[in-house]
Every structure is written in structure tokens, then in C-alpha cells.
Amino acid sequence: MACLLETPIRMSVLSEVTASSRHYVDRLFDPDPQKVLQGVIDMKNAVIGNNKQKANLIVLGAVPRLLYLLQQETSSTELKTECAVVLGSLAMGTENNVKSLLDCHIIPALLQGLLSPDLKFIEACLRCLRTIFTSPVTPEELLYTDATVIPHLMALLSRSRYTQEYICQIFSHCCKGPDHQTILFNHGAVQNIAHLLTSPSYKVRMQALKCFSVLAFENPQVSMTLVNVLVDGELLPQIFVKMLQRDKPIEMQLTSAKCLTYMCRAGAIRTDDSCIVLKTLPCLVRMCSKERLLEERVEGAETLAYLIEPDVELQRIASITDHLIAMLADYFKYPSSVSAITDIKRLDHDLKHAHELRQAAFKLYASLGANDEDIRKKIIETETMMDRIVTGSSESSVKVRLAAVRCLHSLSRSVQQLRTSFQDHAVWKPLMKVLQNAPDEILVVASSMLCNLLLEFSPSKEPILESGAVELLCGLTQSENPALRVNGIWALMNMAFQAEQKIKADILRSLSTEQLFRLLSDSDMNVLMKTLGLLRNLLSTRPHIDKIMSTHGKQIMQAVTLILEGEHSIEVKEQTLCILANIADGTTAKELIMTNDDILQKIKYYMGHSHVKLQLAAMFCISNLTWNEEEGSQERQDKLRDMGIVDILHKLSQSADSNLCDKAKTALQQYLA
């Protein structure tokens, strides 16, 4: 909504507006300052809790006039303060109200007001700023535009408990990401806010706590600092632990648990520290019980999922705390009975947000089952859980779908479950549907899971192949998203492992040699490694090697040459030499190496390389080329001897590396046989 409306629109909009609303605005223009003040006070009383009145006054142009009065040097402090109060009340209406206030540049005006010496006016400006900055329509960046604002807010923290509460609330809402964390940290946020945790005001303690949770999130620098901060002779983590005791308000318990969780994940607190194992984790499990409110259960489960995600031991402890796995099953039966919730408004709210519970449960199940086979088994054996997760993967909410697919991905790491539950529930069917049409964030997880379902021992591999997976995966390799390219090629690599010639031919045909070579020159190392892995799996078993090299030999040899000449890692070059070793194992394919002096020189070079892995891979090539039971072995041996390969073999047979020594001796025996 614009700040001032054009004249032609006024009549249609104003038909809704009462004369009394216009009367309030007209009084703001009275030449008598006392009448203006009374007009603002009356306006304040009129708009409290009345959204329609707020909208009317905004349409009638009250905001620019209030801002003008607020900024006028001739206005009394009382008038300025009352203007700030009314503007704060208007901001508490709808999101459209906030947009209108932002369009009128309210933030610079209020920030200017903070330079006043009058505390009541400062508090009114801060209260209004707090309301505006906590609205989802306000860009956080507006707090950081002027570099003098943050230091001034830090200085105002000492003025009163209200300045402390509002400023901390503004910081916790406007601190989004590492850049904001760094700005606040560099301006002394930790030192300025730490002592507020012992404030006599609950609201101040709570807002300070929220500040620390957003400052510490994924931030090792802040987290490492927090660990050593003393407040009244007590370390900050000890204060957080006291705040998550059962006798404290739930909001405080949860936020303290978040602070400790984030500090732990940022590496500032060990995962086996008693404050995590005996305090934070049990507190978060408590938040998952059905006695808690929906929001608390969601936040508790999501924070716990984040805490235990990388640590097997914490996953095991959580899985046996308060029957957590069974407790999470209740997240899907919500609300359990309508009569249990007497507040109809609450019931309506919870029905609208029940999907958040499912999302949180899937996230926590995914973390619990990330590593341990027994935990995965427990999750899957929980009443109809596989059906619920499979259903979740096709829900309309993107967040629920993502969490459900993550959960399936976590469970798909189990060989046992791939062979049993995943087959019983034909998980591959909904997964293929998800892969047809989903946002990238879901595609990345779903394609990762497909990689697992395509492992050679998975019974789902056959039906997936029959349902057009090759084309789908080849399509993923052309994505602009590197994670999707990696997963597409990884799944093809798993598909090609010990596969029949027909499947390999399908992969090569669908992928096209052009795309294969594009992937071999991909800037992402993971893509390159998986493409080499695919090539290695395609070039296995002699008939397949000979067939593929007869049609694509020239291009493959060209790609191999480029990689061996390029600036690549040891791992990439090792994989490439292993591909050459596979080619050297072909019956007719090996001639492509023997007739390529450039490649032979490269193999010789890598036999003398300083890295043992590369020497070993080059040795495999030589062994396969000199194997004397095969036709033409004598000519090959002679050519390699002339190149000085035998001398290198003698040298390597004296190597301190036992592996290298054995391989060299085996190759030399081919010459003696």
C-alpha cells in the first residue's frame, strides 16, 4: 500500500472510511500544538485492537503526518513519544500496515529518534522498531544500512530494562546468517548482552537468551567465545544449563537447549560433555512429549535432530531416552482427540499446523537412523511407520516431502532394510514419482536415495531400471546444480556395476559421448570422480570392454590423456589409471594402448611417480598388458622392454612398499615364463 493515495482513487477507498476516522487525521493539522497532542492521544485510544480503524487511518494519510510531527524539532517530547506509540500500534495490525509504514520510510525516522536524550521517547521508538523488525515483511538489512546504528543500539542497552528487551528482540530477529553475526559480534554483542542473562526481568533474560541462540548458530567464532564468558563468576554454559531445568518456563528451557546445541554443533562443546548428554539431550526429548504444545514439540524435535545428526553415540542415547521412537509416532496422530483441546481457536490453529509435527518427526527419525542398524530397525518396526514415511514423500507441503524423503534416505543406508522393508513397501515407486517433478532441494535427497536403491544387492534395482531410470538420471547429469549432477552420475555408476551389456549400452546411448566428456571436464571434482567411476564400471568384463572400446575407444583414450596431463588430484589420476588397466584387460581393446606411444609414456612416468597409489595403478596396466597367457603377449612384452619398463620393474621389486614390490615381481614373472 502506498504512503499517499492518488486523488482519483480516494472516493472509492474513502467510501469505506468513517467520518470519525477523517476527524482524527484532520486534528493532526491543527495549528494549536496542545490540540494536536490531544488528537494523537485520542487516535492512540481509537486504534488499540481495532485493525479496521488502523487501515482507515493509514489510507487517510495519517502516517506521513505522524512521522512529520515525530521528526519536527518544534514538537514537544511528549508529542513525539505519543506519535511513536501510535505508529507502533499501527504496525501491530496487518502485514499490509507494516508495508505502508515501510513505504513511508519509518525506520530511518525512528532510528533518528534514538538520538534523543529523552528515555521515554527512545523506548517508544524502540518498541515501534521492535514491532516492525519482527514482522516477516521487513527486510533485516534495513538495520545494517547505516553503520552507526548497531554501536548506538549497544550503547542504549544500559539505559533501561525496556531498551534491553526491545534491542535484544530486534537483534535476535535481524541476525540472519554469518554476515549479521559478525557485525553484532564485532560490536561487542557477547559482552554487552551476557550480563542481561541475570536480569531481574524475565523478558530481558529471555530476549538475551534468544540473541545468543541466533549468534551461536553454525558460528564457531561466537560459540568458542561464549564457552569462556563469565557472568557473576559463572561460565555461560553453566548458566544455560540452569535455565533448562524443569522448573523454568518451557520457552526458556527450549532456548537454552538451543544455545547449548548450537555451541556443541559449532565445536565449542564436546558431544560427550555432561551438559549435552545429561542435560541438553534429555531436555529436548522432554519437549517431544504429547503434554507439550504443538510449537514446543516441533521445535524440540527439530533441535534434537540437529544436535544428534553427526554423532552416533548421541543417536543411540536419544533412541533409548523416554521411549523417544514410540513417542514420535504420536506426532502423526495429532490432535489425538478433539475433546482434549477445549480451546476451539487452539484446535483450529493446531489442525492447520499438524503438518509441521510430521515434518519434525521425519527430521528426527532421519537423524536417529543415520548410522545405527538397530535404531533403523526400531523406527521401521514402529506402527505403520514405513507407510507414513512413504505417504509423507508425496504430501503437498514441500517441507514435509523433503523431511520424509530425507528420512527414507537415512533408512536406505541399511543393506538389511533395502532387502526387506524397502522391497515390501515398493518404496521405489513413490520415489520415481518424486524424481519426475520436485524442487531441487528434494531432488538432491531423492536422487541420493536412488543411488542406494541401485546398489547391486538391492531388489529394487530391476524395477527401477524398467521404469525409465536411465533417461531420468542422464537428465540429472545435465543439471546446473552440481549436487544433482553428482547424484545422477553416481546412480548411473551404481547401475553399471556388474551390469549386463544391454544396460551399459542403454547408459551410453542415453548419456551420449558428448555429455560423458562434458562430465569428464566438469569443474566439480565429485562429478569428475563419479564419472570416472562410471567409466570404470562400464569397462569391466572383457567382452564389454572390447565392445565399448570398439565404438567409443578414440574418445575415451583422448579423455584419459587429457586427465593424465591435467592439474588433477592423486585420486582422479589413480581412477584414470585404473580405467586404463581395465582397457588393458580387454582382448582387442588393449591394442588401443599399445598403439598409443603417448599413453605408454604416461604409464611409464606414473610407474616412477612419488605417490605409491599412482605407481600401483600404473603397475596394473603393465601386468594386464604383459600377461603371457594371452595372444600377442610376446610382442607387447618386447615393446615395453624396449621402452625401459623391465628396468623400472627390477627397481620396484626392491621397493620398501610390500604391495608395490609384489606387483613388480608378478609382472617380471610374465617375462620369465
Swiss-Prot record:
- The chain residues annotated with the modification Phosphoserine are 337, 512
**Which residues are reported to carry the modification N-acetylalanine?**
2
Q: Which gene encodes it?
A: Armc8
Name the job this protein performs.
Component of the CTLH E3 ubiquitin-protein ligase complex that selectively accepts ubiquitin from UBE2H and mediates ubiquitination and subsequent proteasomal degradation of the transcription factor HBP1.
Q: Main location per UniProt? A: nucleus
Indicate where this protein resides in the cell.
Nucleus; Cytoplasm
> What keywords were assigned to this record?
Acetylation, Cytoplasm, Nucleus, Phosphoprotein, Repeat
Question: Which positions carry the signal peptide feature in this UniProt record?
Answer: none
Give the record's GO CC terms. cytoplasm; nucleus; ubiquitin ligase complex
What is the official name of this protein in its record? Armadillo repeat-containing protein 8
Q: Report if keyword Cell inner membrane is assigned.
A: no
Q: Which organism is it from?
A: Mus musculus (Mouse)
Q: Quaternary form?
A: Identified in the CTLH complex that contains GID4, RANBP9 and/or RANBP10, MKLN1, MAEA, RMND5A (or alternatively its paralog RMND5B), GID8, ARMC8, WDR26 and YPEL5. Within this complex, MAEA, RMND5A (or alternatively its paralog RMND5B), GID8, WDR26, and RANBP9 and/or RANBP10 form the catalytic core, while GID4, MKLN1, ARMC8 and YPEL5 have ancillary roles.
| ARM repeat start and end residues | 51-92, 95-134, 138-176, 178-217, 224-265, 269-309, 313-352, 374-413, 416-455, 458-497, 501-540, 543-585, 588-627, 634-673
Record InterPro entries: ARM-like, ARM-type_fold, Armadillo, ARMC8/Vid28
